[in-house]
Amino acid sequence: MNELFSIAGKVAVITGAGGVLGGNIAQHFVQQGAKVVAIDIRQEQLDNRVAELKQYGQDVIGIIGDVLDIASLEKVAEEIVAQWGQIDILLNIAGGNMPGATLASAQTF
C-alpha cells in the first residue's frame, strides 16, 4: 500500500464494532496494521468481536460505550488516550446498519 495512505500504527476508533458492518471494517483495519478500538453497547458481541479481531493482530481493545450518552463517550475517549495517547481515525458505524436507520427522501431536506 502507498505509504501516503497507510493506516499502519494509526489508532482507529470504530463504534458499532460488534455488528456486521462495523466488525468487518474493524477486521480490515487490523489487517492493515491499525490499532483498533472496538466500541459497542453490547458486551457479549463486543467480547466476541475483540476475540475474533485478535486473530489478525494484537493491537485491539474493546470498550463498552453508548454513542447516545455524552458521559459514556467522554469516558471512552479518556480510556483510549490513556491506552494509546491519541485518536487518529473515527468511524461512527453504530446504529447505521439497522432497519429504520435510514431517512426517507422527504426527511432529507
Placement of each model-derived feature along the sequence:
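Canonical Rossmann dinucleotide-binding motif of NAD(H)/NADP(H)-dependent dehydrogenases/reductases
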Residues: 3-37
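A glycine-rich helix->loop->beta "capping" turn
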Residues: 7, 56-59, 79-92, 98
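Structural signature of the Rossmann-like NAD(P)-dependent dehydrogenase/reductase core
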Residues: 14-16, 92-95
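Conserved glycine-rich Rossmann-like NAD(P)H-binding loop of the short-chain dehydrogenase/reductase
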Residues: 32-49
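Structural signal for short hydrophobic segments within the conserved structured cores
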Residues: 37, 60-63
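The beta1-alpha1 cofactor-binding region of Rossmann-like NAD(H)/NADP(H)-dependent oxidoreductases
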Residues: 43-44, 64-76
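Short, conserved SAM-binding/catalytic segment
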Residues: 49-57
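Conserved mid-core segment of classical short-chain dehydrogenase/reductases
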Residues: 74, 97-109
